[in-house]
Structure formats: structure tokens, C-alpha cells
A protein has these predicted regions:
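Residues within the alpha-helical elements of helix-turn-helix
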Residues: 17, 28, 39, 57
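Helix-turn-helix DNA-binding elements, focusing on the entry/boundary residues of the two helices
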Residues: 11, 22, 33, 48-51
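Conserved hydrophobic/aromatic packing and binding residues within compact polymer-binding modules
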Residues: 11, 25-26, 36-39, 65
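Recognition helix of helix-turn-helix/homeodomain-like DNA-binding domains
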Residues: 30-45
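Short basic helix-loop element that most often maps to the first helix and adjoining turn
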Residues: 9-25
Length: 93
């Protein structure tokens, strides 16, 4: 599996395992939700700094984003749809 695919698979797996909506992870990492979606679909090529920020937001070591999935592992299922929580407002600088 290529690096971009590993990162995509692991970010999604960790996020879904912890019940974190994609929008919330993107907000907490300081990136746009559409970019996070692209990252999970292997459409984006994130920098090492961004991967470090995402790993920190997920509270895992950066190396966890490059772990090979077990043989026969399937793509994590999406979180159940439902009402989205209100997004917190960003503080003005």
C-alpha cells in the first residue's frame, strides 16, 4: 500500500473508531472539511506538518498514520448520519 493510501486508511480508521465526525476533526486540526475528505479519499497530498497536526488532534504518534492494515481489513464504515452538532465559532485574532 502506498503512503497516501496508508495515511488515508489510518486517519479514517482512527477517526471512526473514536466516533469523531470528519467535520469536527477538520475543525480541530485547523483545516477545511473538504480537504479532510480529500485526504481520506487519497485526493490530497498533505505535508508532514499537516500530518503531524492531524496526529496530534487524534492524540496518536505520527507513525500511527503509516501502520499497515491487517490482511483482509476493510475500509472503516462511515459514522451513522444524524444531526450534526453546532460548530464552535473560531476566535478572532
Amino acid at each position: 500500500m502506498k503512503a497516501r493510501a496508508l495515511v488515508a486508511w489510518n486517519v479514517r480508521r482512527i477517526r471512526v473508531d473514536r466516533g469523531i465526525p470528519q467535520e469536527q476533526l477538520a475543525y480541530d486540526a485547523g483545516i477545511d472539511r473538504s480537504y479532510m475528505s480529500g485526504l481520506e479519499r487519497q485526493a490530497e497530498n498533505p505535508t508532514i506538518d499537516l500530518l503531524d497536526r492531524i496526529a496530534g488532534t487524534l492524540d496518536v504518534h505520527l507513525s500511527e498514520l503509516f501502520v499497515q492494515p491487517p490482511k483482509g481489513a476493510t475500509t472503516p464504515k462511515p459514522l451513522p448520519k444524524g444531526r450534526k452538532p453546532a460548530r464552535p465559532r473560531r476566535k478572532k485574532k
